[in-house]
Amino acid sequence: LCEGDAVSIIEHMSDSMATRAAEQLGDAVDARVRAEVAEAVAIADYATAHEWHSGDPYDVIGTRPVRLGADGTPLLDEFVALELAALKQISIAAATWLIRDILNLRDRHPQLWQQVQDGALPVFRACQLVQEVARWGLDAGQA
């Protein structure tokens, strides 16, 4: 081997390593997006499993319904945020805000929710958008 051949081999190895690393990074990003979407859908499903319906009986002493989201979102069991906080190992306040954002996204902005599910819009960005819209105080029809 002459010096030029060694340099060429090293450059080729570096290029192939960089290509592999770029592919690994792309795969990791895709996996993260899929995981974030799956988590958002799971949170929405978890909230649905804890919905209160208008005919459901409740007592002042027992579990009560609460509305975590804005107008047009369902009433939920008051302990749903506590349970989600335990499952995700986050604070109750963070769980409450997360449920609020996901419910607002799913129930008040279905087209945006679909974009999130398709992976076209990051979950965090969609949550920022629904937080901003919620500040306007619109009812479900206006949102």
Could you tell me what each predicted segment is?
Residues L1-A143:
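Peripheral, non-cofactor segments flanking catalytic/redox cores
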